[in-house]
Amino acid sequence: MSEFLLIVHVLAAATWIGASVLTGFAGPRMAREGGPAALGWARVSREASLKVFNPAAGLTALSGILLVVLGDDYDWSDSFVTIGLTVVVITGIIGSVVHRPDAQKIIAALESSDYPTATEAGKRAAIWGALTIALLIVTVSVMVMKTGAG
C-alpha cells in the first residue's frame, strides 16, 4: 500500500509543479498577445485552478498524510513531513488570497478592455506564482533528501 501511495504522491506533486511551471511560462506570453488570446488563457487558467491545481495539491497532501498514518517509514516528527504540510497550507493561502481573486480581476479587466488593470494583476499573479514554484521545488528537494527523518 505504501508504494502505491508514494506513486500517487509523486505523480500528484509532479502534476502540481508541472502545471505551475507551464502557467508561469505560457501566461506572460499569452498576456503579451492581448485580446482574445489573453482572455482565453485567463479563462483556461481559472478553470485549471479548479480542475488541475486544487485536485493535484489536495491529492499530494492526502497521499502524504496517508503515507505517515498508514506506514512505518515516515513520522509526524520528520522535518520533511512538517515542511510539506506547511507548504500545502501556504500555497493554499496564496491560491485563495492571491490567485483566485487575481484571476477574476484579470478576466473582468480583459472583458472590459481594461488592459492596465489586467497587466497589473497579471504581474502580481506571476510574482506569487514564481514564489509558489520555488516553495514546491524546495519541498520536493527536502522530500527526496528526507530532511530531518528520524
Model-derived features: positions:
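Polytopic transmembrane helical bundles with strong interfacial aromatic enrichment
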Residues: 1-150
